[in-house]
């Protein structure tokens, strides 16, 4: 089993066609076919089911493709790090973020990388914490920002920020960032919240139980843009971190107020897989995320406590 065979396996598995893989790799079809046959002979089982419309991975083939992708990625990272040792950062980084963080941070981070490290290829994954953890464990994600993760032996965790949540209402409600709202007062609000698997919903409901406060949730949406749109249409109020709505508050379409007694807060962390070395490009992403978050805190765009 060699690097060339694994690369061929990955491309045929992705394209489902020997001819398409040959065109992509600029290698003759018979040569690719011999590589796959050699792999199958070595392993002792078919890696593809062959039919008139192409080639489909078997269960063994799918498993080997997953491992091969990790190997090929590590080889590329090693090459990029060797080049980067001369001071020029290059390579690729897959960064995972919860939706509320992605809307706040991804654009800023992408611009900074484009300006400072144009040879780094970034890919962003926006998903819930459970999916991001799975991506880290499977090595599909290099670095993730997570909310309040439970202890995971497979992850290396670095605290980033303790974030405050705010009541967000239409602009005409005239909520003020200088006039906090009591948590129990939320019982009088028509609330629009994310679904039950979202960390904001879980946190709000936890504090509601602790405060013996009954909330009136009339609509659910896991999309940040939908929640903001619904609030601007005066369908109700929601609960979000301040950076999510900072621009809307400046424009006057939304207003917000801190929540107290108790104050719902979430802890954000940076996470990487413990069984994987951090590439130079990934380490640079860690540094830039910390820098961007610190700048937003200093400008009162992101309200919270740096950790």
Predicted region positions:
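Secondary-structure junction motif
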Residues: 176, 190-211, 278-287, 293-304
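C-terminal effector-binding regulatory domain of bacterial HTH transcription factors
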Residues: 242-253, 261-307
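Alpha-helical linker/hinge and terminal dimerization helices associated
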Residues: 42-43, 64-86, 299
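Short helix-boundary/capping micro-motifs
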Residues: 10-28
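Hydrophobic hinge/microswitch elements
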Residues: 128-133, 137-141, 146-147, 197-255, ...
